C-alpha cells in the first residue's frame, strides 16, 4: 500500500515498469494552475506554468513578457493602466 502522504489528490500517479518486470506506482506533484490577470482574471499568455524548479531553469525573458506589468496584467488591462497613468500626469 502507498505511504499516507501519497494518499491524496496532490500527487499524480503513473505506473512504471521496473527492470525486474514489476509495475510500480511513481508519484509526481501536479503542475500549478495557469497564471491569471490580477485585474480581470483572464488567463495570461506567454507565462509558462510549471513547478518552481522548472521555471528556475528558464532564462529571464522566457519566464514572463518583457513589457511593463508583464506577467501581472493581460494586454488589455495593461493598455488601460498605461493610459490612466499618462493622463494623470
Swiss-Prot record:
S-adenosyl-L-methionine found in the keyword field: no
Key words of the record: Ribonucleoprotein, Ribosomal protein
A GO cellular-component term linked to this record: ribonucleoprotein complex
Region of interest: Disordered: 1-29
GO molecular function, one term: structural constituent of ribosome
Pfam family name, one: Ribosomal_L34e
Gene3D superfamilies tied to this protein: 6.20.340.10
InterPro entries cross-referenced by the UniProt entry: Ribosomal_eL34 (IPR008195), Ribosomal_eL34_C_sf (IPR038562), Ribosomal_L34e_arc-type (IPR047868)
UniProt biased composition (Basic residues): 13-29
GO biological process terms on file: translation
Top-level taxon in the UniProt lineage: Archaea
Keyword Ribosomal protein belongs to the record: yes
HAMAP family found in the cross-reference section: Ribosomal_eL34
Homology family: Belongs to the eukaryotic ribosomal protein eL34 family.
PANTHER family the UniProt entry points to: 60S RIBOSOMAL PROTEIN L34
Annotated protein name in UniProt: Large ribosomal subunit protein eL34
Gene: rpl34e
